[in-house]
Amino acid sequence: KALHGPWGEDGQTQKILKKNKIPFSHSNIKSSNLCFNKSASKREIIKNKLMSPKFYLLNINDLNEKKLITIKSKLKKFVIKPNRSGSSFGIKIIKNQKEFDNLISNIEEFKKELNNHKEILIEEYISGKELTVSTIKLDKKIHALAVTEIKSKNNFFDYKAKYSKGYAKHILPAKVTKINYSNCLKLAIK
C-alpha cells in the first residue's frame, strides 16, 4: 500500500518519520513537497533546461470567464487542475470550444469542487503517449530503471483509471523507439 494526497505525497509523513528517526523508502521530504506543488515542480524543470508545457498559476478567486478567455487565446487546448494535489483530482482537459463553453458555464461549480485549493494551474495540453520513468537513488547516484507507458480506458489517466481494476494498462517496457526510450531515461535523471 502507498499513501496518497496531502500527508501522503507532500512530504509531511516523511517529515514525521525523519523527526522520529524511523527509516522509510521512496522520496525524501524535499522531493515529495516539490513534486506535490505542480508550479514549483515546473519552475525546477524549466530551471534545469527541460521542456515543459506553458502554464499559468492563478489564485482560485481569480478564476473567471474573462481570465479563461484570455488564457484560451494563448493556449488553444489546456489542462486545468489544482496546483497542490495528486491522483488526478480536479483535472479538466479543454480541447475544443464545446468543452470550453461547458467550463465557462460551470465555473462556479468547478471552483466549489476545488474549495480546499487556493491555487489553480492551467497548462498547455499536449497530446501523446503517457510515459513514466522509475528512478532509484543508490550510493548518492540516481539511476533510471525503466520507461513505462500508461494507457487509460478513459480520456486520460484519471482517478478512476489509477485506482479501479481494468481501467489502465502499464506497458513495460514502453512501446517507443529506442532513441525515445533512451532519451526518457536520460531526462529522468537530469
What are these regions (language model features)?
Residues K1-N59:
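Conserved N-proximal alpha/beta basic substrate-recognition cap immediately N-terminal to
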Residues I22, S85, K162-S164:
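Short connector loops/turns at beta-strand edges and beta->alpha or beta->beta junctions
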Residues H26, S88-F89, A168-L172:
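Short small-residue beta-strand/loop micro-motif enriched in glycine and branched aliphatics
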Residues L34-G128:
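Active-site nucleotide/adenylate-binding loops and adjacent lid/helix of ATP-dependent enzymes
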Residues K95-I179, N183:
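Phosphate-binding site of ATP-dependent enzymes
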Residues N183, L187-K190:
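C-terminal active-site/capping subdomain that shapes the small-molecule cofactor and substrate pocket
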